[in-house]
Amino acid sequence: MGSEFVSFKPWLSNDSAFATHISYTSKEEQLTNVTNCTAIENGWVWNIPLWNNMGTGYCYSSDFVDDETAEKEFKKHLGTDDVDLQKIDIRHGRRKNAWVKNVVGVGLSYAFVEPLESTSLASTHLLISKLIEVLQRRKFNLTKFDIDGFNYSATQEITEARNFVSIHYYLSSRCDTPYWKYQTHEREFMHLDDTYPSSYMGITFSSWYKKILYQHSSEHVWDTNDRGVAYILAGMGHKPISEYYLNWFRQEHPDVDKYLDNVYAQWRQYVESISRYVKTLPTSYEFLKEHIYD
C-alpha cells in the first residue's frame, strides 16, 4: 500500500544469516525448552530444539564479514562441514504505518526484528488481538482516531522489541573482533531517536537509553518492569550496587547488614525450594514424548 519502510539498521547491524537443521547426538539431553543464542566472531548463532532435529543458524553483518568467511565460522561452530546451508538476506525494520486504508499489516508484512521466533510470534499475536479490539470497540464504526491509535500502538510494540534486542549488543563486554568492538565501543546510542511517531510526547530512544544510564550509574536502582532491561544487565555481569552508597547507608543505619543478611537468607531459601521442586519434574524430552509426540 506504499507505506514507507523504516530501517532499524542504526540499531541492528546484522543483515545476513545462514540457516540449517542438524541431528541430535543425545536427544534426551539436547532437547530443551529454550532457544539458545551463542555469540561468535561476527554475530550470533541460534539453536532451536525441535522434536526431530535442531534448527540452527548464524546471524551476522556483511559490513564486517563476507559470506564465505561467515560460512566457515558457522561450520566451525557446528563442528562439521556436512551441512546444507540456506542463505537469508535480512532487512530489519517496520512499515511507517501498519494500517493503511483497508489493509492492515501484521507479522512479517509489517515488521522484522532479527530471526527471533518468540518475538515474532508474540508481536503477531499482540497486533491481531489489538486489531480485534479496535474493530469491536464501536462495532466496526471506525474513524481516523482508531486507525491512528492502532498504528501508534503497533509502532510502540515493535520498537520496544527492537530496543530490547539492540541493548543486548551494547551491554556486552565482548570486543575481541572488529564486529564486537563496534557493538560495545564504537556504536553511538546516545543520540538515536525515532522511537515513537509522537516525539512531542518526549518518548524517544535517547530518552529511554538515558533513563537506563541514569538508573545504572546514578540511582543504582534497576527498574524490573522496564521491558526486561534489568535482566539483560544482570546477565551481562552488571550489578545495581554502589559500594559508596552502601557504606554510607551502613554508617547511618548500623543494623543494615543484619537486615540484608535476613533478605539474602529468605531469597536463598526460596531458590533452594524451587530447585528441589524442579528436580521432581520431567525433562522437556520426557514431557513432550509423553504428552505430545507419543
Cite the ranges covered by each PLM segment.
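Predominantly flavin-linked oxidoreductase catalytic cores and closely associated redox partners
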Residues: 1-78, 128
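Generic detector of intrinsically disordered, low-complexity, polar/charged segments
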Residues: 40, 90, 104, 225, ...
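Long, low-complexity C-terminal extensions of enzymes
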Residues: 133-294
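Generic preference for hydrophobic/aromatic residues in regular secondary structure cores
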Residues: 18, 32-33, 85, 103, ...
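Tryptophan-centered motif/residue detector
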Residues: 1, 5, 41-46, 90, ...
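FAD/FMN-dependent oxidoreductases across multiple families
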Residues: 51, 60-172
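Glycine-centered secondary-structure boundary/capping sites
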Residues: 2, 107, 111, 275-276, ...
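Hydrophobic alpha-helical segments and their boundary regions
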Residues: 32, 82, 224-226
